[in-house]
Amino acid sequence: LTETYTDEYLDLLISCVGENTEIPETVGEKFYTKTSEMAIPRKLSSFLYVLNEKFSPEETKCNILGREEETNLLIQILSKATKRNAILVGEPGVGKTAIVEKLAWKITTGNCYEKFKDLKIVVLEVNSILAGTQYRGSAEERFNELIKFLEQNPNCILFIDEIHTILGAGACR
Protein backbone atom coordinates (compact mmCIF):
# COMPACT_ATOMS: atom_id res chain seq x y z
CA LEU A 1 0.00 0.00 0.00
CA THR A 2 2.73 2.49 0.92
CA GLU A 3 4.64 1.85 -2.28
CA THR A 4 1.65 2.43 -4.55
CA TYR A 5 0.09 5.54 -3.08
CA THR A 6 1.56 8.87 -2.10
CA ASP A 7 1.62 10.21 1.45
CA GLU A 8 -1.06 12.76 0.59
CA TYR A 9 -3.41 9.98 -0.46
CA LEU A 10 -2.75 8.07 2.75
CA ASP A 11 -3.28 11.24 4.81
CA LEU A 12 -6.66 11.68 3.13
CA LEU A 13 -7.55 8.01 3.61
CA ILE A 14 -6.78 8.06 7.33
CA SER A 15 -8.64 11.32 7.86
CA CYS A 16 -11.70 9.76 6.17
CA VAL A 17 -11.47 6.49 8.12
CA GLY A 18 -11.11 8.24 11.47
CA GLU A 19 -8.60 8.86 14.19
CA ASN A 20 -9.30 5.81 16.34
CA THR A 21 -8.68 3.29 13.57
CA GLU A 22 -5.64 1.06 14.01
CA ILE A 23 -2.96 1.74 11.42
CA PRO A 24 -0.54 -1.04 10.44
CA GLU A 25 3.00 -0.32 11.58
CA THR A 26 4.38 -0.17 8.03
CA VAL A 27 1.88 2.52 7.12
CA GLY A 28 2.40 4.33 10.41
CA GLU A 29 6.07 4.90 9.60
CA LYS A 30 4.98 7.18 6.79
CA PHE A 31 2.88 9.30 9.14
CA TYR A 32 5.24 9.75 12.03
CA THR A 33 8.67 11.25 12.25
CA LYS A 34 10.33 8.98 14.77
CA THR A 35 12.55 10.73 17.23
CA SER A 36 14.40 8.92 20.03
CA GLU A 37 11.37 7.73 22.01
CA MET A 38 8.75 10.06 20.67
CA ALA A 39 6.87 9.87 17.40
CA ILE A 40 5.84 13.30 16.15
CA PRO A 41 2.91 13.09 13.71
CA ARG A 42 3.92 14.02 10.20
CA LYS A 43 1.32 16.82 10.19
CA LEU A 44 3.21 18.43 13.07
CA SER A 45 6.78 17.56 12.12
CA SER A 46 7.29 20.84 10.27
CA PHE A 47 6.22 22.80 13.37
CA LEU A 48 7.67 20.70 16.22
CA TYR A 49 11.02 19.23 17.08
CA VAL A 50 12.55 17.65 20.18
CA LEU A 51 15.26 19.91 21.57
CA ASN A 52 16.83 17.15 23.69
CA GLU A 53 18.05 15.45 20.51
CA LYS A 54 20.36 18.37 19.82
CA PHE A 55 22.57 17.15 22.66
CA SER A 56 24.29 13.87 23.43
CA PRO A 57 24.15 12.35 26.94
CA GLU A 58 27.94 12.00 26.84
CA GLU A 59 28.55 15.74 26.39
CA THR A 60 30.47 17.09 29.34
CA LYS A 61 30.55 20.74 28.32
CA CYS A 62 27.62 22.84 27.26
CA ASN A 63 28.30 25.14 24.34
CA ILE A 64 25.80 27.66 25.70
CA LEU A 65 27.69 30.17 27.80
CA GLY A 66 26.14 31.74 30.85
CA ARG A 67 22.42 31.65 31.56
CA GLU A 68 23.07 29.45 34.60
CA GLU A 69 21.09 31.61 37.02
CA GLU A 70 18.13 31.91 34.64
CA THR A 71 18.16 28.18 33.87
CA ASN A 72 18.18 27.29 37.57
CA LEU A 73 15.27 29.67 38.16
CA LEU A 74 13.37 28.00 35.30
CA ILE A 75 14.04 24.58 36.86
CA GLN A 76 12.71 25.84 40.20
CA ILE A 77 9.53 27.13 38.55
CA LEU A 78 8.97 23.87 36.68
CA SER A 79 9.57 21.89 39.89
CA LYS A 80 6.77 23.58 41.81
CA ALA A 81 3.60 21.62 42.52
CA THR A 82 1.26 24.24 41.08
CA LYS A 83 1.47 27.30 38.86
CA ARG A 84 4.49 26.03 37.00
CA ASN A 85 3.91 27.56 33.60
CA ALA A 86 6.95 29.67 32.89
CA ILE A 87 7.11 32.33 30.20
CA LEU A 88 10.37 33.93 29.16
CA VAL A 89 9.90 37.54 28.12
CA GLY A 90 12.56 39.83 26.75
CA GLU A 91 13.90 41.77 23.80
CA PRO A 92 15.02 39.86 20.70
CA GLY A 93 18.47 38.36 21.08
CA VAL A 94 18.71 38.39 24.87
CA GLY A 95 18.85 34.58 25.09
CA LYS A 96 15.39 33.25 25.83
CA THR A 97 15.92 30.26 23.54
CA ALA A 98 19.42 29.75 24.98
CA ILE A 99 17.92 29.31 28.46
CA VAL A 100 15.66 26.54 27.19
CA GLU A 101 18.54 24.96 25.26
CA LYS A 102 20.60 24.94 28.45
CA LEU A 103 17.69 23.25 30.24
CA ALA A 104 17.53 20.62 27.47
CA TRP A 105 21.27 20.04 27.84
CA LYS A 106 20.91 19.60 31.61
CA ILE A 107 18.05 17.12 31.14
CA THR A 108 19.90 15.15 28.46
CA THR A 109 23.15 14.89 30.42
CA GLY A 110 21.41 14.23 33.74
CA ASN A 111 22.52 17.46 35.46
CA CYS A 112 19.08 18.15 36.92
CA TYR A 113 16.54 16.82 39.39
CA GLU A 114 15.53 13.18 39.13
CA LYS A 115 11.96 14.06 38.12
CA PHE A 116 13.28 15.80 34.97
CA LYS A 117 15.30 12.82 33.68
CA ASP A 118 12.60 11.48 31.32
CA LEU A 119 11.27 14.82 30.13
CA LYS A 120 11.52 15.92 26.52
CA ILE A 121 11.48 19.57 25.53
CA VAL A 122 9.36 19.97 22.43
CA VAL A 123 9.82 23.24 20.56
CA LEU A 124 6.86 24.70 18.69
CA GLU A 125 7.78 27.24 16.05
CA VAL A 126 4.61 29.27 16.17
CA ASN A 127 5.46 31.29 13.06
CA SER A 128 5.48 28.17 10.94
CA ILE A 129 2.26 26.81 12.45
CA LEU A 130 0.48 30.02 11.47
CA ALA A 131 2.19 30.44 8.09
CA GLY A 132 0.29 29.12 5.11
CA THR A 133 -3.08 28.95 6.82
CA GLN A 134 -5.69 30.17 4.40
CA TYR A 135 -8.47 30.53 6.94
CA ARG A 136 -8.85 30.57 10.71
CA GLY A 137 -10.12 26.99 10.87
CA SER A 138 -6.89 25.73 9.33
CA ALA A 139 -4.79 27.18 12.15
CA GLU A 140 -7.25 25.81 14.71
CA GLU A 141 -6.90 22.32 13.20
CA ARG A 142 -3.14 22.52 13.59
CA PHE A 143 -3.43 23.64 17.21
CA ASN A 144 -5.95 20.84 17.91
CA GLU A 145 -3.48 18.30 16.50
CA LEU A 146 -0.81 19.81 18.75
CA ILE A 147 -3.05 19.50 21.82
CA LYS A 148 -3.81 15.84 21.00
CA PHE A 149 -0.09 15.15 20.64
CA LEU A 150 0.68 16.78 24.00
CA GLU A 151 -2.12 14.84 25.72
CA GLN A 152 -0.66 11.59 24.37
CA ASN A 153 2.85 12.56 25.54
CA PRO A 154 2.58 13.85 29.12
CA ASN A 155 6.36 13.79 29.62
CA CYS A 156 6.84 16.87 27.41
CA ILE A 157 7.67 20.45 28.18
CA LEU A 158 6.32 22.63 25.38
CA PHE A 159 8.49 25.60 24.50
CA ILE A 160 6.64 28.00 22.23
CA ASP A 161 9.25 29.93 20.31
CA GLU A 162 8.22 33.44 19.22
CA ILE A 163 5.10 33.37 21.43
CA HIS A 164 4.75 37.15 21.10
CA THR A 165 3.24 36.60 17.64
CA ILE A 166 0.20 35.07 19.36
CA LEU A 167 0.10 37.30 22.44
CA GLY A 168 0.25 40.48 20.38
CA ALA A 169 -2.23 39.30 17.75
CA GLY A 170 -5.22 41.57 17.41
CA ALA A 171 -3.71 44.39 19.41
CA CYS A 172 -4.50 47.91 18.23
CA ARG A 173 -2.36 50.97 18.61
Tell what function each PLM region has:
Residues 136:
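Flexible, glycine- and charge-enriched loops at secondary-structure boundaries
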Residues 133:
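Short beta-loop-alpha junction of Rossmann-like oxidoreductase domains
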Residues 1-130, 139-172:
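Histone-fold recognition with a strong bias for associated Lys/Arg-rich disordered tails
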